[in-house]
Amino acid sequence: MTIIIGSDVDGKRLKELIKDYLEDNDYDVLDVTEGKDLDFVDSTVSVAKEVQKSDDNLGIAIDAYGAGSFIVATKIKGMIAAEVSDERSAYMTRSHNNARMITMGAEIVGDTLAKNVAKEFVNGHYDGGRHQIRVDMLNKMC
């Protein structure tokens, strides 16, 4: 599994913090916006496209409030994403919705919470079963 991470200018500091945290915990991390000053649209598209290259990839996109990146991610065919600002939602969106990507707002989520959100998201596993009905419904919408 590779964690694809990216941010716009407003999310850069938090992105670096999360990236360092994940790498310190032996996750394979690919920063698709390293050294770039991108708008949230471009940064989110970069994350989503890289996530879709492998079924094992997960993505984290960070902007000021998380909403912009969420809107962009959900416009991409086949992408299930969630805007999260708490650990439980991050875990549950993986387990029940099979989300491949989360978005966070650097102006909303503090440092410790951001690390915990990332940890719960990447440690979550899709439960399948009855939840697959919803995932199929989402995929039919694209």
Curated annotation (Swiss-Prot):
The keyword Membrane does not apply. Keywords: Isomerase, Lactose metabolism. It catalyses: aldehydo-D-galactose 6-phosphate = keto-D-tagatose 6-phosphate. Transmembrane segments: none annotated. Disulfide bonds: none annotated. Pathway: Carbohydrate metabolism; D-galactose 6-phosphate degradation; D-tagatose 6-phosphate from D-galactose 6-phosphate: step 1/1. It is an enzyme of class 5 (isomerase). It comes from the Bacteria. One of its GO terms (biological process) is lactose catabolic process via tagatose-6-phosphate. Gene3D superfamilies: Sugar-phosphate isomerase, RpiB/LacA/LacB. Its EC number is 5.3.1.26. GO terms for molecular function: galactose-6-phosphate isomerase activity; ribose-5-phosphate isomerase activity. Belongs to the LacAB/RpiB family. HAMAP family: LacA. Heteromultimeric protein consisting of LacA and LacB. This is Galactose-6-phosphate isomerase subunit LacA. The lineage of its organism: Bacteria, Bacillati, Bacillota, Bacilli, Bacillales.
